[in-house]
Amino acid sequence: MLESRRAREQSGRDSFSRYRAQVRSAAVATLSILEGLDVDRVYCDLHDDFVIRKNDGSGLTYIFYQVKTKGKQNHNWSINELFGLKSKLKDQSKQCSKSIKESFIGKLLLHTVVFDQFCNSVVFQSNIHNSDEVIDLMDDIESGSFSNKFTAVLIDRFNECFGEGAEKYTLEQIKERLSKLCFQSDVSYLKEGDSFFDLVVKEKIYQFSEIELERAEFREILLRLLDLVERKSSGVIKTWDAESIETFAGISIDDLLSILSISKDAYLALLNGGDPNAVRSASMIQRSLKAGGADISAVMYCSRCKIDWDLWFRNARHIVPELELLSISERIGSTLWKSVGPQGMLAVSTLRQPIRDLLIELESHGLKFDLTEDLILGGIFSALVKGKS
């Protein structure tokens, strides 16, 4: 009976679908934090759909994302839908400044003014493609030509639309701000259905942490990740300060370590010890030991041993002949692969005797130097991490 009459409206369903796409995109963005490079925060539903913070040698900058989807996959975004520009208007001086300012791209370009040098870029992300006119406009900006008729309108109206107070931007300043605009079109994980999104998330988790997840384990992590993004996207931030923004909108490495059940202490120890792949190392050490029944104290102990080994090895490269270092590393690798169990399981108790035997062997070949049982143990876990990278 219900199907016999079409519903008066389905705007709620459409709005929920768009919100779901926004959450998915932010969830994928948060996983880039695991890479351990310059992305250290993602802020959800703050100033725009989400914001990525980059922290490099020159300081903090922000990438503002706006996520828009369309149900019809064969639809292309028009220049009017995105920029508020009428494509068939012969006299470009009659373009409406208000339409430009209130358009999707107009709202993104405002960030380049409000946040000035702290705005790294602004991104329009979608599940569909752009029209040829939009592509031509972006090619014109990216090439540095700025000769397209629609680009000329944006330049001409920039101060009227986005100028703050009496401040007027020069031609070069306007070009610099327009050049911060980027498009990410036909994004697979924004399309209908879960298969693309699930695949991207699983690949990124493996890429940054070397965790091979069983189906049930992956679903649990995925649900926790989506729940985290939804929580950070909801509610009003009543006290507008840095601490409140971090608490109610920000996602950091701490949140992701919790979701992936990776020891924060082990991660920090490895990070502070100079390991550039601290997430991956902590994950692999923890999973191999926990498979053998170890607790978190064993994870911390083995992580510290790996740090000490890495430091010893870096220093030894300047003192010990390379052939001898290679011989030591080869013997440690052999000890590892003789000791590792099913699914990469390692138990500290089963490593004691092989480590002692290896030290005796190294001494007999004049390769012991100042190596200890703890350093050899660290070398074994260093070999484990390198072997799976």
Located regions from the model:
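Acidic metal-coordinating catalytic centers involved in nucleic-acid phosphodiester chemistry
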Residues: 1-17, 69-354
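Generic structural motif recognizing short loop/turn segments at the entrances and edges of beta-strands
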Residues: 38-40, 58-63, 117-121, 365-367, ...
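Hydrophobic, glycine-enriched assembly/anchoring segments
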Residues: 350-389
